[in-house]
Amino acid sequence: MRYPGIEIKIEEKELIISTESQRKKIYAMLGTYASHAKNMFRGVNEEYEYGMKVVYSHFPIQLKEVSGKLEIVNFLGEKEARYAAIPEGVKMKISGDEIKLTGIDKELVGTTASRIEKATKVRGRDTRVFQDGIYIVSKA
């Protein structure tokens, strides 16, 4: 991570993020750096976990993990399978109609959950009636 005006140092087992500028934009970026560092330290100590729920009414959705991808079969009775990429660093556990995503990188786990949710987006139909999909139900 690099940004003009922000210095990152490690002194005596402490991470120091500092700036000499008084500008709001640089202070905002300083806070962003600090937040990312805290998330990284927390992720190493305790993994981030997202819980997802498979919801369907008529056509049972079937899930399989296939070579780094989540294969979603029989979504709304479709013949073609839908896929969502599962990057390295994210562990996925499928049990019945629940999916648990875990990993040390908060952004990566959250992005993966979002990709899975978007892979089952209903298009061209009334979403009040067709509520099938895979949804995020918990974050930890």
Where in this protein do the model-derived segments appear?
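Ribosome-associated RNA-binding proteins
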Residues: 1-140
